[in-house]
Amino acid sequence: MRYGTLGEEINTTEVTDEFETLQTIKRTKQNIVGWYFYSFSSEPFVVSAIATYIPLLLEQFARHNGVTLEDHSVHCTADHDKCVLGLFSNRIYIDTSSFALYTFSVSVFFQTLVVITVSGVVDIWNTVTFKRNVLLLFGIIGALSTILISRIYNTQYYMLAFLCILSNSCYGVVNVVGNSLLPLFVSEYLQHNSSSLDERDNVDILTTLISGRGASIGYSSALVVQIISIFLIKKSKSSENIQVATLFVGIWWLIWQLPMSWLLQDSPISADVTPEDMDNLSIHKPKKWIFKFSNLKHGWSSLFQALKHAKLLKDVVIFLVGWFIVSDSVTTINSTAILFAKTELKMSTLSLIVLSILTMINAILGAFTIPQFISRKFQLPGEKLLIYIILWASFIPFYGILGFVFKNIGLKHKFEMFITAIWYGISLGGLSAVSRSVFSLIIPRGQESTFFSIFNVTDKGSSILGPLLIGLITDYTHDIRYSFFLLFALLILAIPIFHLLDVERGKKEASSLQKIPIAD
């Protein structure tokens, strides 16, 4: 029998270690591709369906079942400017535009409850495989409920509202769990890429790069969906048939999430991996699957624990307060502008979809160029970049306010809406990419789902307030233009808050909290 020398054994070990490293890097790159599919499959829902189709459908259903503002015995038609919808056996009447805003506000409320509950369970079984299964489960439910929207009659406005709430709640879970994977993949890639370990800034660069690409891919898929939707609507029996577009969005979401089932996998555990590494990487050994109802409260207890240690998370608190205001106003700008264009400027459904397409194209441009070129060229840190994007976005409601002063400018004509869509798209894409990357840098490792659920509370949960206030303003004035005052004030208010944000200090805060156990 021949025994190898000590040198041969060492070489064999080195080859084995190198092979394991290459396999892990390969798996990480595959996971990143799978993460792109999460954005590619689900983004058309929030960008196309929630932002365009469903608000129009809600207003359309409300108008079909509504009456005129002046005389509640007269059925509302497309020729009437001001219509109201009777709810709860006509006990109360609301503006037909407000029905869409109130429904969205309620949907975000339920979305917030579901997201916090589910994210805690995800953090307990903190593996890529488990998170993938959660993504697929809620993605399938959300996609099917979106498809069902296309099958209801225009008299079923309560059912439409219910399906909107269900699908939006499912998307919230998909969004939070999907975003929580980003810092795991970045840490894992840099952990096994020796050429990058000497540069601390590579975490920031890689996070921003992947986040920007994900946002661009998501908006690109939404753009494709919008273009195909125009063709489908033109081929349908009615040019106002928006339900065929929601059908296509649901099918798109259902099909394109399937590649995640084989792309998102746990990486193999190397023999030299330390427990500290396992806390940061997506290579956790799965816990034994024993579900307890007590696990459902883990997200809430984790949330309260995180808030309890807010003194260690000064910059996270600053970010969330600022983002609560910005997300509320920017999200509400879209639904307000769509309803404004339809009710005040009388734009057709196809024209409104074109507006959405222009928004998507420029959102892709903003998500791609702002993090990768503008940020690098001018050496702008993420917190400063956010301030400039907010200033850019604030011009939209300001221009709408000018309509009270001037007769011919200030969103008085249809062509102005197309210019506004371009302007809005750039700000939307930039905010989407930069906000996720900045937040992922200042949260503790191993608690991504919980903290991204907090991010979702501010990102989506703030949308409870915005549409509610706009709905109340519209119900009181029956003129949605007045809502631009509120939107402009909110954006300006956020600027001094983000001026206080310090990302480098936030990283140290996150490292401190990472050492404090979160209660189960």
Swiss-Prot record:
How does the entry describe its membrane topology?
Multi-pass membrane protein
The record's SUPFAM superfamilies line, in alphabetical order, gives: MFS general substrate transporter
Q: Quote the subcellular location field of this record.
A: Vacuole membrane
State the CDD domains in the record. MFS_Atg22_like (cd17483)
Query: What are the record keywords, sorted?
Result: Amino-acid transport, Autophagy, Glycoprotein, Membrane, Transmembrane, Transmembrane helix, Transport, Vacuole
Where is it mainly found? membrane
Carbohydrate attachment residues = N11, N193, N280
Task: Please give the Gene3D superfamilies that the UniProt record associates with this protein.
Answer: MFS general substrate transporter like domains (1.20.1250.20)
Example of a GO cellular component annotation carried by this entry = fungal-type vacuole membrane
Free-text function comment from the UniProt entry: Vacuolar effluxer which mediate the efflux of amino acids resulting from autophagic degradation. The release of autophagic amino acids allows the maintenance of protein synthesis and viability during nitrogen starvation.
Q: What family is reported?
A: Belongs to the ATG22 family.
This chain's protein is named Autophagy-related protein 22
Q: Species name for this entry?
A: Vanderwaltozyma polyspora (strain ATCC 22028 / DSM 70294 / BCRC 21397 / CBS 2163 / NBRC 10782 / NRRL Y-8283 / UCD 57-17)
Give the gene that encodes this protein.
Answer: ATG22
